[in-house]
Amino acid sequence: MIELENVCFAYEKEIALRYVDLHIEKGDSVVIQGPNGCGKSTLIKLLNGIIFPSEGKYFYQGHEINEKALKDSRFAKWFHQQMGYVFQNADTQLFCGSVEEEIAFGPVQMGLSEAEIKKRTEDCLHLFGLEKLRD
């Protein structure tokens, strides 16, 4: 169901994931734990299609997950309906003032630029047909 093959990811000069292999079958329970800075959040972002491997491959249900695949709106909608995660401090996410703020919450927590947050929020509003409900 989920497979990573020799996945690497780096933030500029800082290596976050180095040659990670992972195989998770449907029904498996998985815990990702480790000290600060070991790559847990990076791995979760990668599994959710927020970032992509600089090396290696990521497969979900036999489909390679990469930037090109997720540019296909039908595929992206299918994938994002299947995959998601809960933030470590989920209580702070509840009850944003608008649908737009709720969608932007994740990218804000990831520390993305204002322009990238706006782009991703607009993409999600469009993908799920929520433009009229943004406010």
Name each model-derived stretch.
Residues 56-68, 79:
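Conserved ABC transporter NBD signature motif
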Residues 91, 97-108, 118, 122:
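Short helical segment in ABC ATPase nucleotide-binding domains corresponding to the A-loop/adjacent helical element
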Residues 14-15, 77, 132:
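Short coil-to-beta microelement around the adenine-binding A-loop and adjacent beta1/P-loop entry
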Residues 115-134:
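Conserved ABC ATPase "signature" region
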Residues 33-35:
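The feature captures the beta-strand-to-loop junction immediately N-terminal to the Walker
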Residues 48:
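Helix-to-loop junction immediately C-terminal to a conserved catalytic motif
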Residues 24-26, 78:
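Conserved hydrophobic segment flanking the Walker A/P-loop of ABC-type ATPase nucleotide-binding domains
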